[in-house]
């Protein structure tokens, strides 16, 4: 009986959805796993006068404000 109970507990633990975490790009090739409360990936581009724009990427709890901003909510959507 104890073996059956232990087996059922193990199967239950393995089948539980322990939570979904979003994955976003932090740099062009580097990714980061977001915190559970961070449900948005963003990409923010700051144009430069000399031609090299600066791009920031990451996770957020809300869509930050800014020019040339992209917000999305699926894995690796902010490339």
Curated annotation (Swiss-Prot):
One of its GO terms (cellular component) is extracellular region. Pfam families: Toxin_cobra-type. Expressed by the venom gland. Residues 1-21 form the signal peptide. It comes from the Eukaryota. The keyword Disulfide bond applies. Keywords: Acetylcholine receptor inhibiting toxin, Disulfide bond, Ion channel impairing toxin, Neurotoxin, Postsynaptic neurotoxin, Secreted, Signal, Toxin. It is found in: Secreted. Transmembrane segments: none annotated. GO terms for molecular function: acetylcholine receptor inhibitor activity; ion channel regulator activity; toxin activity. Disulfide bonds join 24-41, 34-59, 63-71, 72-77. The keyword tRNA-binding does not apply. Binds with high affinity to muscle nicotinic acetylcholine receptor (nAChR) and hinders acetylcholine binding to the receptor, thereby impairing neuromuscular transmission. Competes with the binding of alpha-bungarotoxin on muscle AChR (from Torpedo) (IC(50)=0.30 uM). In vivo, causes muscle paralysis, spasms and increased respiration. Belongs to the three-finger toxin family. Short-chain subfamily. Type III alpha-neurotoxin sub-subfamily. This is Short neurotoxin 7.
